[in-house]
Swiss-Prot record:
Tetramer of two alpha and two beta subunits. GO terms for cellular component: cytoplasm. It is found in: Cytoplasm. Transmembrane segments: none annotated. This is Phenylalanine--tRNA ligase alpha subunit. It comes from Exiguobacterium sp. (strain ATCC BAA-1283 / AT1b). It holds the Pfam family Phe_tRNA-synt_N.
Length: 340
């Protein structure tokens, strides 16, 4: 048994020396010192030894076990140090290499257009007014000359929450609220914000989009003031060479009402495939505030008048930057967003 123990020590120490990973060293430990290992078998067989042999073999077994364990511990520390050094070498940073610059964030194209239009109108003396996106039927329709039985309500398929509350279909409710709060005083505001309609999403329609509506109420306001304001707006946003024209239209909250066209960007008014041969592209709607709307808001329509207009933000962005699908604004595709 003495020779067996000495042979075990030689074999174990040699395997420890050859092991190069913590896993292989753990395998050596289990092989020689585990519950089913040869050292355990030797110790179990000591009961068969004579009284004279037992202390000698027991002392030798403990010496061999201690030698194997201490050699294992020392080798594990060596391997740990080697593995750490290799890891550090692999993760070493070359400080002479140029650093990676992070991509700076920027405003979304729609926000850029909104900021540009807001700055433009603020420069013309307008203030910015805002209101809730969840509106009452009163402000979204009735205060804008759209009573419950008005056929024009069918033109705006709405998201109703209850019978009397809905997601606003335009930012005009902000105008109604502002007029009521003004107590008959002059107003010059723009109202930017999200609006919602039950449209099928396609290249030119979205169930959610953004508007900027404008409202001016004062004495002696005329259609000429509306036309002059929109001419300034178009020339500053799209360039001095752009012209506008007004066409008769119908909106319940304005009378008279107009559609506003801009001279074609591609052909300059001569006629092409973009403008469908007309030389003009429709961009927004507006008109003189209906006397009923003024009266419901507390104004004397015999003394004051006003004009209003509504601008689709996505429409402006598509025209100015040549975007052909409104859905690009909301898909969060960086390939599109990073172009602007």
């Amino acid at each position: 048994m003495k020779e067996q123990l000495e042979q075990l020590q030689v074999e174990a120490l040699e395997e420890i020396k050859q092991a190069s990973t913590q896993k292989s060293l753990n395998d050596v430990r289990i092989k020689y010192l585990g519950k089913k290992g040869p050292m355990t078998e030797v110790l179990r067989g000591m009961g068969k030894l004579s009284a004279e042999e037992r202390p000698i073999i027991g002392e030798l077994a403990n010496t061999v076990r201690t030698a194997i364990q201490s050699t294992l511990d020392a080798r594990i520390e060596e391997v740990k140090a080697i593995e750490l050094e290799e890891k550090l070498k692999a993760e070493t940073l070359d400080v002479t290499l140029p650093g990676r610059t992070s991509t700076p964030g920027h405003s979304h194209l729609l926000q850029q257009i909104i900021d540009e239009m807001e700055d433009l109108f603020v420069g013309l003396g307008y203030t910015i007014a805002e209101g809730p996106e969840v509106e009452t039927d009163l402000y979204n329709f009735e205060m804008l000359n759209l009573p419950k039985d008005h056929p024009a309500r069918d033109m705006q398929d709405s998201f109703y929450i209850t019978e009397e509350t809905l997601l606003r279909t335009h930012t005009s409710p902000v105008q109604a609220r502002t007029m009521l709060e003004a107590n008959g005083k002059p107003i010059r505001i723009i109202c930017p914000g999200k609006v919602y309609r039950r449209d099928e999403d396609d290249a030119t329609h979205s169930h959610q989009f953004m508007q900027i509506e404008g409202l001016v109420v004062d004495e002696s306001i005329s259609m000429a003031d509306l036309k002059g304001t929109l001419e300034v707006f178009v020339k500053q946003l799209f360039g001095e060479t752009r012209e506008i024209r007004l066409r008769p239209s119908f909106f319940p909250f304005t009378e008279p009402s107009v559609e506003v066209d801009i001279s074609c960007f591609k052909c300059g008014g001569k006629g092409c495939n973009v403008c469908k041969g007309t030389g003009w592209i429709e961009i927004l709607g507006g008109g003189m505030v209906h006397p009923h709307v003024l009266e419901m808001a507390g104004y004397d329509s015999s003394k004051v008048s006003g004009f209003a207009f509504g601008i689709g933000v996505e429409r402006m962005a598509m025209l100015k930057h040549g975007v052909d699908d409104i859905r690009h604004f909301y898909t969060n595709d960086l390939r599109f967003i990073e172009q602007f």
